[in-house]
Structure formats: C-alpha cells, structure tokens
Amino acid sequence: MAGKARVHELAKELGVTSKEVLARLNEQGEFVKSASSTVEAPVARRLRESFGGIKPAADKGAEQVATKAQAKRLGESLDQTLDRALDKAVAGNGATTAAPVQVDHSAAVVPIVAGEGPSTAHREELAPPAGQPSEQPGVPLPGQQGTPAAPHPGHPGMPTGPHPGPAPKPGGRPPRVGNNPFSSAQSVARPIPRPPAPRPSASPSSMSPRPGGAVGGGGPRPPRTGVPRPGGGRPGAPVGGRSDAGGGNYRGGGVGALPGGGSGGFRGRPGGGGHGGGGRPGQRGGAAGAFGRPGGAPRRGRKSKRQKRQEYDSMQAPVVGGVRLPHGNGETIRLARGASLSDFAEKIDANPAALVQALFNLGEMVTATQSVGDETLELLGSEMNYNVQVVSPEDEDRELLEPFDLTYGEDQGDEDELQVRPPVVTVMGHVDHGKTRLLDTIRKANVREAEAGGITQHIGAYQVGVDLDGSERLITFIDTPGHEAFTAMRARGAKATDIAILVVAADDGVMPQTVEAINHAQAADVPIVVAVNKIDKEGADPAKIRGQLTEYGLVAEDFGGDTMFIDISAKVGTNIEALLEAVLLTADAALDLRANSGMEAQGVAIEAHLDRGRGPVATVLVQRGTLRIGDSVVAGDAYGRVRRMVDEHGVDIEAALPSSPVQVIGFTSVPGAGDNFLVVDEDRIARQIADRRSARKRNALAARSRKRISLEDLDSALKETSQLNLILKGDNAGTVEALEEALMGIQVDDEVALRVIDRGVGGITETNVNLASASDAIIIGFNVRAEGKATELASREGVEIRYYLVIYQAIDDIEKALRGMLKPIYEENQLGRAEIRALFRSSKVGIIAGCIISSGVVRRNAKVRLLRDNIVVTDNLTVTSLRREKDDVTEVREGFECGMTLGYSDIKEGDVIESYELVEKQRA
C-alpha cells in the first residue's frame, strides 16, 4: 500500500480489529487517536511485519491464497476448480452457444470483468507494446511441478506471463476467446461466450488464445519463479501484472484473479478481472472490495452484527409523543431529586433533545438542563420501559458521603464500646393543651411566658435530671409546637426522639394536631406515653380520653393494652414524678439506648438562628460520639469549626456526650432545622460536602417551585395574572420554614399566586429592601425588626414591611391580601324592559327609539341589550340619552313612554330593550 493508510483500513487488510491495531501501534510507540487516523507508509510496513509478515493482498499472492482455500475445501485440482467456476458463470448468463467476437486487434486479448474497468486514458498509458516480454517469471503453485513451459503460440521462446491459464481438460478443450478491456467497441459488463473451436495463433497485432489453451495443448502448467513486476503485463497476457492488485486501497484483478482477469488500475483504480476473481466459484466480482481479501467482492457488503442490532433496536424503540426513544429492558435508573433531562439521557445513553421533544409533544415544556419533577421522570421512564427511582434524601445524602468515606447513622466500634445514653423525649400534642407548661414544671423554669401569644413557635431542647430509685437519671426533652402550621417541626421532632409524650387536655379531648402527633410518632416507630393534662379543671374526663385514643391504636394498660396513661396537672404539679418514671420504665423495657461516645460526633440540628453578636447559632442534639471544641462540622449546607458550645443553662462546655442538646457557635451560615450534622477530619471536606448539598437543594427547589404549563393552558398562562411576592425573615430557621409552608398552603384561587422569592434568618437588611423594591414584594418579619437604614430605605422606596409575633396572624393577613387581589366577580341585576313602538330619525343624534316601559325601570347610562323575537341582536349597549316629553330625565318607570338613543342603528319596531346593571359579588 503506497502512501498513508488509515487504521481501520489496515485492520481489515490484516484481518484483525481496529482495537488490536491501535494496541499494537501503541506498543511500537506510535500513539494514534482513533481508527480513522492515518499512519505513514513506514509505520504501516512495520505493523504488517509485526502481524507475522502479512503483506497487502497483491504482494502476498492473492491468487495463491484463494486457490489454496478452494482446493482444500473442494478437494479438487486447481484447474478443475477454476474451470467449473467459469463454466457456471457462463451458463448462468445464458451463454449456451459460443461464437467468435470481433474486437480491436490492436490491443492485447484480455477477458472482461464484471465490474468497471479503468479509464481509457489510463488503459492506453498502461498497455505495454505488443510482444514485450514479461519480466515476471511464474511462481510454482502447491501441488504442481515446476516444469518448463512451452513457448507462447504467438511468441516463440518468450516466457509465459505471470498468470498462466489452466491446463485444458483431457481430450483437448477448445480455447476461450478473451476480450480487450481497452477496446471501446466491447461492453465491459457483457460476458463473452466460449468459442466452439480453437483459434490459430495470433501475431502481436492479433488476438491470442488463452495460455495453456493452444491447439492440442495438454502440457503441465509452467512454473512461476520470482516476484511479479509492478508494471502492467504484456498484451495478450492473461492477467494484469500490477503487484499491488489494482492499486493502493482497492482490490482489483491483479495477482489472484481468475484467468482472463484484466490488469490492475492506476493508483487505486480497480483493475479488470474475470468473474469473481479470486473469490468463491460462481460469485460475480465487483470493482472494489474489502482490504486483505483477494479479488473482487459483491458490490453491497454485508452488514455487521452491530448495524443489524442497531436497526432492530431502532424498529423496536417505543414512540413517546411522536418521538422514537430508546427502549429499556426494565432496568432501574436512579436519579436524584430535581434531576434534569440531560441527567436522565446520560443514564440511558439517549439524546436529550429527543426527550425534550417528546415532553413538548405531550404538553410539558422543559429544557434539557431544567430540573424536572419526580412524577414527570417516572412517567417518561415507564413509557420507555425504564424503572426510574428518584433517590430519597437519605439515600442521596448517603451517596454524597460515600466518596469521602463517611457514613451517617451507624455506631462505629464493637459492642463493648457502646455505653448507655439518656433517652430523648419529645412532648407533642394539640395547641394549648399544656405541653410547655408541663416542661416548665419539669425544668422548674417559666418558658411559656416568653412565647408570643402563649404558643410555642420554636423547638426547645433541654436536659433535666430525674431521681429514680435513689439514682439520678438524665432525660433530654424536646418541646415541639402544637399549632397546625408547625407540621414539619413536629415530624422533625418525632424523627429525633426515642419516646413521645402525648399531652391531651382532659377537658378538650382529641383534636386534629393530637391525631397528627400520633401519626408522626407511629410513622417513626416511637413508643408513646400519654399524659392526660388539666385533670384539675372542671369538666375533665380522663376516661373519655382513654376511650377516644383507643380508636387510634393507643390502648391503656387498664384496658389490656400496652400504652401507659398518666393523669397529670402541669399547673399544680400532680403526678409529674410518675410521668417521668413511666418514661424511664418505657425506655428500659422497650428500647436499647446505647451509643459509642468514642467516635466522631453525629446528630441532628434541632434549631438554628442568627444572633447579632455571635453569628449563626445552631441547637444540635448529639446522637452518637462526642462533640468537642475545634471539631470541623458540617450540617446540611452549612459548615464551620466549633468555636464555642453552650448548654441549656448558658454555661460553656468543652464536650457534649450522646443525647446532649447544646448550642454550637462557629458555623459560616445558618443550618436548616432538621439537618444532620457530622464531624469530619478537616474544613476542606466539610466545605465540599456543604457545597454539594447546597447544589442539590437548589435543584430540588427549582423542580418543586417550577410552574408547569401545558399547551392547552399556554394562552391563559400568557395573560396577566396577579401574584403576591413575599420575603420572609425570622428569628430562627424552623420558624421561617413553618411560616413558608403555612403560607404556601393557602388555597384561594388560580387567578392569584403566592411566591416566596427569598427567606432568611435574622433582621431585615437593606439588601432585603432592595430586592423587595425590584420585585414588588412585601417583607414579612417574624420576631425580627428592620435595621435603621433599612427602615429609611423602605420608606423611600415604598416597600411595605409587616411585623408579626404570632404565626396565625400572619397567615390570616396574607390570606386576606390574596383574596383582595382576586378579580371581582360581577352579577347581573335586571332593571327593566322597554318595547320599541316607533322610530324617529335625527340628523344630530341618529335614530331615536320611541318606547314604552313594560316592566321595571330604565335609567340613563345603564347597560342594555337589544332583543328581536327573544333573540339577542347585540349586547353591551348604553342608554346615551333618555327623554320624556322633551325633558331629559335620569330614569323612566313602568307604564310611561319615553325616547332614548342607544348609539346603534339596526333597530326595528317591535324590538325589546332589556336594561340591566352589573353588581360586584362578594367572594366566598
């Protein structure tokens, strides 16, 4: 192969895969990128030598290789095999009779080839003069003796060509007539029939019979020695003598062609040849074939298994929204919450544009990089036969920590390293049932008075000592809000607890938040101890409470159940010690409360807020390990180093053991309430984990807050809609979260929308005011105030700031504001009817209708509609003028005649004018 060659061409030539060729080139120090790259001629030569000295098809004697395979497969001699193949080809073309063909005698006699021959110009250049001897002595084939050959009939004493024809069959077979591929008078594609009789020997200017096919010739095949010369064969030679078998990259009729094959083409052009030159017997050869294969091949190559598989998969692919998408085998695809179509396409090896088009046709308009909701991903996956699993936050966080070799939620070490820890108890129940009063009594502190409106709006964590059987035991209490707006905070408290105390007022009974607290505790598989409070009040009925709670699976021990009921009075202090003993007994009997205090600390952030002097402050509950000063800690998307720890009494501590609630100072930002925290080796790891969690949270928020618009609703979505933008600021993260969820749960109407554009912990700053001014938002401050400059800026910009101390007041005000933004609803109120009796035309005012009021009243400037035969002719007309007896009047009542103009000309006698007014209706 002259010049450069591509890797995949060399692979086909050598009969190996492209990967093997690339690997061999890399071993030789030739770094090639891909199978389509080219290599220089010396590199290609070394590559062929490295594969056992394999050479191109023309150089290694393609005829010899093909003849070996055919002789071995059929068990016949070479001559019989070639004769049978040629006979079959001639018979298949219907050549039953043979006749001599007149051709141009100025050129050599060469049989035709089924494929296309070289151009006439190149043929004339490559055709050597007649009578020039060939410089390529023959090479003996296997199984044949190298006896000297007889002189050529037309050239005595001249050695034979490089490709002699087969010996005639016994009895003397007449020679076949070849055809000149350089002759324009002979069609290249038409086969030549066999002549019935041998032709006499030809002169250099005449046609010559096939070598070995002379009259009476029956001698052995001449031997072949040496290598063929690179030039073309002499005229009259049975084959072309190009050593590269038809050029650089094509397979022609050079060495390896059947007798009668034409010479090879010029620099890559296919040479002429006989039928199926070098291929299987009876197969029609083509002009060009695959590399490394001798002779011609069928024009249309066979498809590889990979191509067939791709075509089959394409036909079997499902059609979703008019787009053909990949078809899965039911495999599970795991996607993070808030994933995009690009993420999904990468998992299934699909084109993201196809997924976008499919969703668009289904009425869902998303981009390839936009976060998509869980339901959309699952629906799209089911249509494509994929089981899409949206990873839960816990599993997602576990996968996030795996690259850092970190785990959360498991105690490390052996059993002997586990130590008994205090139980964590959550006080739950309906609002105003006495939860905080009970905790006050236990702590001997007045916490309730500090809460606005007497309603707990934070999660408080405290640890108290209890004297049980002469030994002091510690119990950690978590106080959760009971208001309906704090559902998430109650659920968070249930997940972080060991035992739940359900406080139910004896005079009030089971309420909605009581049932919700039961559901949270049962969902978290937490044992429940029921405290029936306010037994000192009139109308208290503890037995009624026991009966009501039986419906929810809480059966008292008195009724044969396993739930402990304690009748208490938090105000007086009745049976408080019995309640604490019940908690400890339940913990000892039903739970194995042990933890490893020697490992790095892990736990949960109960509450967090932004302090003016201390910065972000987080109340954390250590669940396992020991938290120490100087530890690098990460909680949610916040990270930092522990600079200070304070217990519930405000005392600085150096270390916090399991089940200890402490305030941690040192975070770079405010953690979210309920975020898991853990200690890592260095600040760099903490920052990387926090950044990844922050990105994950943004994607999930974008997927949840994105408003879906279908094609059917596109027109209405483009219309102007009312939207109330809010900025929420609070004193701690839990309160802000609860306020946002409560506000987003307000159901008013589809015409108005509520959008929280920003939220944060701490006072209202100038940045908040600037954002509110740019987005026409209202700032809601919960237990926080605005700074002096922020107040002045808000006054100048006209930004409204609303302050609240009780959460339900904020909810009520926002709901009223949303209802005020609704478009008014108008109700039609019928005023009267007038019948047109006569028409008068005026050049000044147009047509005047002379009417009589048949019912009700007709007022000037009132809305009217024109009826003809009880069919509305036109609507939304206005009484522009109203007169009675030449006097302008404001209204005319029933039974009186009047004249009026409507600004409408299509009026006839007998028409009816119906007067009405639109009255705004109060929304429900």
Swiss-Prot record:
<feature type="region of interest" description="G4">
    <location>
        <begin position="533"/>
        <end position="536"/>
    </location>
</feature>
<dbReference type="GO" id="GO:0003743">
    <property type="term" value="F:translation initiation factor activity"/>
</dbReference>
<feature type="binding site">
    <location>
        <begin position="429"/>
        <end position="436"/>
    </location>
    <ligand>
        <name>GTP</name>
    </ligand>
</feature>
<feature type="compositionally biased region" description="Low complexity">
    <location>
        <begin position="202"/>
        <end position="212"/>
    </location>
</feature>
<dbReference type="Pfam" id="PF03144">
    <property type="entry name" value="GTP_EFTU_D2"/>
</dbReference>
<dbReference type="InterPro" id="IPR027417">
    <property type="entry name" value="P-loop_NTPase"/>
</dbReference>
<dbReference type="Pfam" id="PF04760">
    <property type="entry name" value="IF2_N"/>
</dbReference>
<keyword id="KW-0963">Cytoplasm</keyword>
<feature type="region of interest" description="G3">
    <location>
        <begin position="479"/>
        <end position="482"/>
    </location>
</feature>
<feature type="region of interest" description="Disordered">
    <location>
        <begin position="118"/>
        <end position="325"/>
    </location>
</feature>
<dbReference type="InterPro" id="IPR044145">
    <property type="entry name" value="IF2_II"/>
</dbReference>
<feature type="compositionally biased region" description="Pro residues">
    <location>
        <begin position="192"/>
        <end position="201"/>
    </location>
</feature>
<dbReference type="InterPro" id="IPR000795">
    <property type="entry name" value="T_Tr_GTP-bd_dom"/>
</dbReference>
<dbReference type="InterPro" id="IPR009000">
    <property type="entry name" value="Transl_B-barrel_sf"/>
</dbReference>
<dbReference type="Pfam" id="PF22042">
    <property type="entry name" value="EF-G_D2"/>
</dbReference>
<dbReference type="GO" id="GO:0005525">
    <property type="term" value="F:GTP binding"/>
</dbReference>
<dbReference type="InterPro" id="IPR000178">
    <property type="entry name" value="TF_IF2_bacterial-like"/>
</dbReference>
<keyword id="KW-0547">Nucleotide-binding</keyword>
<feature type="compositionally biased region" description="Basic residues">
    <location>
        <begin position="299"/>
        <end position="308"/>
    </location>
</feature>
<dbReference type="InterPro" id="IPR036925">
    <property type="entry name" value="TIF_IF2_dom3_sf"/>
</dbReference>
<dbReference type="InterPro" id="IPR053905">
    <property type="entry name" value="EF-G-like_DII"/>
</dbReference>
<feature type="region of interest" description="G2">
    <location>
        <begin position="454"/>
        <end position="458"/>
    </location>
</feature>
<keyword id="KW-0396">Initiation factor</keyword>
<dbReference type="InterPro" id="IPR005225">
    <property type="entry name" value="Small_GTP-bd"/>
</dbReference>
<feature type="compositionally biased region" description="Pro residues">
    <location>
        <begin position="150"/>
        <end position="173"/>
    </location>
</feature>
<keyword id="KW-0648">Protein biosynthesis</keyword>
<dbReference type="InterPro" id="IPR006847">
    <property type="entry name" value="IF2_N"/>
</dbReference>
<feature type="region of interest" description="G5">
    <location>
        <begin position="569"/>
        <end position="571"/>
    </location>
</feature>
<feature type="binding site">
    <location>
        <begin position="479"/>
        <end position="483"/>
    </location>
    <ligand>
        <name>GTP</name>
    </ligand>
</feature>
<dbReference type="GO" id="GO:0003924">
    <property type="term" value="F:GTPase activity"/>
</dbReference>
<protein>
    <recommendedName>
        <fullName>Translation initiation factor IF-2</fullName>
    </recommendedName>
</protein>
<feature type="compositionally biased region" description="Gly residues">
    <location>
        <begin position="229"/>
        <end position="295"/>
    </location>
</feature>
<dbReference type="InterPro" id="IPR015760">
    <property type="entry name" value="TIF_IF2"/>
</dbReference>
<dbReference type="GO" id="GO:0005829">
    <property type="term" value="C:cytosol"/>
</dbReference>
<feature type="region of interest" description="G1">
    <location>
        <begin position="429"/>
        <end position="436"/>
    </location>
</feature>
<keyword id="KW-0342">GTP-binding</keyword>
<comment type="similarity">
    <text>Belongs to the TRAFAC class translation factor GTPase superfamily. Classic translation factor GTPase family. IF-2 subfamily.</text>
</comment>
<dbReference type="Pfam" id="PF11987">
    <property type="entry name" value="IF-2"/>
</dbReference>
<dbReference type="Pfam" id="PF00009">
    <property type="entry name" value="GTP_EFTU"/>
</dbReference>
<dbReference type="InterPro" id="IPR004161">
    <property type="entry name" value="EFTu-like_2"/>
</dbReference>
<dbReference type="InterPro" id="IPR023115">
    <property type="entry name" value="TIF_IF2_dom3"/>
</dbReference>
<comment type="function">
    <text>One of the essential components for the initiation of protein synthesis. Protects formylmethionyl-tRNA from spontaneous hydrolysis and promotes its binding to the 30S ribosomal subunits. Also involved in the hydrolysis of GTP during the formation of the 70S ribosomal complex.</text>
</comment>
